[in-house]
Amino acid sequence: MLTKEEKKAIIEEYQLEEGDTGSPEVQVALLTARIKNLTEHLKEHKHDYHSRRGLLKMVGKRKKLLRYLKRKDINRYRDLINRLGIRG
């Protein structure tokens, strides 16, 4: 689970302008942080199937947002996947 401070730091790092919380970049960055946290949780709790389902839903949502961003602006997409260190 992300704390308010962690979430705020991620939003400030990836926002396009002041007060931007809904751009694809911010949404993907927040989902990536949540996915990383949940992945660590699942390494310890291998039989937590409910959380695994939530993880798969988050990965799917991130994939859709990345596909949208790639379609709209390929340069922003490439910049984002490089900054996050994820495969595109």
Swiss-Prot record:
PROSITE patterns: RIBOSOMAL_S15. It comes from the Bacteria. GO terms for molecular function: rRNA binding; structural constituent of ribosome. GO terms for cellular component: cytosolic small ribosomal subunit. One of its GO terms (biological process) is translation. Gene3D superfamilies: 6.10.250.3130, S15/NS1, RNA-binding. InterPro entries: Ribosomal_uS15, Ribosomal_uS15_bac-type, uS15_NS1_RNA-bd_sf. Keywords: Ribonucleoprotein, Ribosomal protein, RNA-binding, rRNA-binding. The keyword tRNA processing does not apply. Part of the 30S ribosomal subunit. Forms a bridge to the 50S subunit in the 70S ribosome, contacting the 23S rRNA. Belongs to the universal ribosomal protein uS15 family. One of the primary rRNA binding proteins, it binds directly to 16S rRNA where it helps nucleate assembly of the platform of the 30S subunit by binding and bridging several RNA helices of the 16S rRNA. Forms an intersubunit bridge (bridge B4) with the 23S rRNA of the 50S subunit in the ribosome. NCBIfam families: S15_bact (TIGR00952). This is Small ribosomal subunit protein uS15.
